[in-house]
Amino acid sequence: MVRSLSPALTTVLNGLTRVPSLALTIEDHVLHYAPYQSPGSADAWNDACLAEDGSLVRVQVTRGGFGFTSNLQVQRITDPTQAVQWSAWTTLPGAAGLIFEDGSCAISNSAGMLRAFAQRGTGGNDLWAWTSLDNGVSWTGPVSVVSPPGGALIKGIGSAGNHDVFFLYDVLGGEAMGCCFYSGGSWSALTAWSLPPIAGGAGVAAVFASALYTLIYSDGYSLFTCGFNPAGSVWSAGPVIASSTSSAIGRVSPRLSQANGLYTLTCIEYDTGTLTGSVYSYPRLRQSADLQHWSEGLILHDLPSTYGAVAVSWPAPPAGSAGARAYVLTLPTIYSASLFQASNPAQYLDASASVLSYTRLEQSGKPARLEVLLDNTQGRYNALVTPVNAAGGYQPIGLNASLVLSEGYCTGSPLTPTVVKVGTYRLAQIQFVRAPEANYLRLVAFDLSRNLDLVARYQQIYAGQTLGYLIAEIAARAGLFTIVLPTTSQIAQIVPMFVLQAGQTYRHALDELCSIYGLVYFLDQDETLQVRELASSDPSVWSYQPEIETISFGSTDQRANHVIVSGKPPIGPSSAALTTGEAFDDAHMRLIGLERLLHHVDPKLSTTVQCAQKASFLLAQQARAQVVHSVTVPLNPALQLFDGLTLSDSAAPTGSGQSSLCRILSLRAHYDARHGLNEMQMELEGL
């Protein structure tokens, strides 16, 4: 998918002379969570939200005593730098000694109206609500929302901030979910879900998006999702975020927040050591762009918690000097990290003027690699590098910081730098290099698809999902949330069973899925995972003739011309029955006078049509691999992996007179100011 260039830049690329231009910025977007405040409050069920004035309002159900005589308390913070605000709690009116401590609690902001929820534990089992119209300064209530039927106890409360409340409550056989809505000055009757009961209840979180509710809830060990359409009060089961086949690992108190287009799901993950011998209890933060596919996330092992943590992005507190920060809130301890701001010199650095040389390498099935040499004369960058294992004092040049590279040429008159972003890379290596004649900084970085080489912590089993769903799922598990899938019919094909194994890399799983129908993928400059189905009808996006510096036209004959694909055997009386599909290259057989057979087995294919489709894709790949070209041309920022090219060499006597339609299989862009190099070397296969 060729990058778009301005008309001026296209004109320069088609010219005979060019003046290279580039831009390189280093940006630290990493959330360096660290202890921020230590109020020391006893751990308990809790929740938090931002009020309209930018203040942070928290609630907790205190613990201790009988269990049905707890308090619901509230806290309002306007200046997060003030420790006293984190330790001050006020009991809400009518909530002293009357709250069920294990019913959990919730708080939400419904268009400026704050509501806090908890279950009455003494004198009734009402779900109570308190209201604040002044950003949490004062509160009224409680009012009864609903009394769960049969005197049931609540096992988790959540609110999406849409004048709503959702909760898990006891029913025969386990727990059910219900909801109520506020309208016209009163709460609606209970709407109970139509799904089967779950074995236990350990928290629920709610979000309202695109006129639908998504609920994430826990039975104590697994994290489930379901949907609710308020238009027809329709419930629907959703995907399982984290499944459990035993009671070894617990997951409780899910909480949701949203910032910068991503949802963050926080839950407490714990192990009592009964089965594994390992004992821990800490928050895990998962992320998602669509509430369907979630990353494995990040653990905060050094932030122990039992009853819940809340992740909040707080860009503008109404008072104090904290600035834009992200927080993970527990009652005993507050963790925080600075949000990225380009105006912060500790997070942003323009290193364009110091680039001595760079090489970027892109190839199929591997993360793109960038190696940069920066001029470090007089130690200009010495103090801007974060030391390895630093616990604070972060600088822009640090491990996992982003290197954003743009390439182009000077255009117009007078000459003006015109560049196009070609990649975003995560810093993996930092080296200071000193010699009598040199002083430079060597940076090596890889694009975000390197996350695909991480290993899965837990096994996940998927049954009856489409290929497109599974590709998006594996990508999200690795932290790749933006994905573009082809619109061909293969993406909608059902994969009967797929297992993401614990200890397996996500790339292994993604490659296995893509191999079903011959798909390829790469990460573009905006960190979008581009998944493509290659076809011989793909257009040529660029033509080369006079610009060619060196070229090699080649071909190889070591390839198959008859492909047989066997899938899952059909169910029937015959034990010898097979599910197969075949593809033939008759022209190649006639050319070489040989049948070269490739036999491929894929049990994920269940029909002869699917087997025939895969056979045709494998045969097409064999035909593409027969073409082996390489070319060196002036650096072209428009080109990406798998783009189609037209190559036409000069006629005799200066050239070979060869021409070809081909596809980029790998590319190496090299810039070296000291040696006057600005070129691109490409390895090509057939289109």
Question: Could you say what each language-model-derived stretch is?
Answer:
Residues 681-687:
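Glycine- and charge-enriched low-complexity intrinsically disordered segments
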Residues 335, 413-419, 431-556:
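Charged- and aromatic-enriched interaction segments used to assemble
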Residues 1-35, 41, 339-460, 515-518, ...:
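Assembly/oligomerization scaffold segments
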Residues 32-341:
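Extracellular, repeat-based ectodomains that mediate carbohydrate processing or recognition
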Residues 106-107, 156, 205-206, 256, ...:
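Short amphipathic beta-strand and strand-loop transition segments with alternating hydrophobic
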Residues 1-35, 40-41, 47, 59-60, ...:
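Acidic, small/polar-enriched beta strand-loop surface segments
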Residues 114-115, 164, 213, 263, ...:
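Short beta-strand micro-motifs in enzyme catalytic cores
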Residues 89, 129, 142, 190-192, ...:
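Well-ordered beta-strand positions in beta-sheet-rich domains
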